[in-house]
Every structure is written in structure tokens, then in C-alpha cells.
């Protein structure tokens, strides 16, 4: 069960915030975010495939940060079950995104080949 005090949820919140901020200005970032950014080209190609009707530069920056984190966790890190990662991404979209963010994030992640 996710709670606001869950350390994994807190880590994901901080990472989404960091990934979001980096799109606007240079700033110090934590090691986990650096690792994700090293895979940014790979992750962004997966996003383009999963949501072909939206170009990367047109996707809401909060949604983009959430997708980057979730796709990294799904395809690179692989330490949590896909259902957990997708559920957590949808929760983050509810917290940080707009009204359509949860369904957009869920739909895009549903199109990712992670087996």
C-alpha cells in the first residue's frame, strides 16, 4: 500500500521533481537522476513509440518526467514488478499532473513492451 511516507514513493517524488526541473534550467541533480538522464535518448524513443500522436516537445513536462522515470524503472532498472511501477506512475500523475495526466501516463505505459 502506498503511503506518503513510503520511502520508494518519496524517492520517486524527488526524482520526478528533479527530472521536471532539469528541463527548465541547469541545476545540481542527484545520482539517480543522472543515471536516468544517461538513458534519456533510449527512454525518449520508447515514449515516442508508446505515444506516437505526441512529440516529446509537446508532452506536458510533468507527464514527461513521470514517463521517463517509469520507463527507466520498467526497462533498465527492473527491480519492481511492472504493475507496481505503472500504478506508482499513475499516482504521481494524479499528484503532480493535470486532469488528463493519469490516463495519458497509464495509456503510454500500457503501450511499452517490457517483457
Language-model features: locations:
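N-terminal interaction/assembly modules
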Residues: 1-102, 107-115
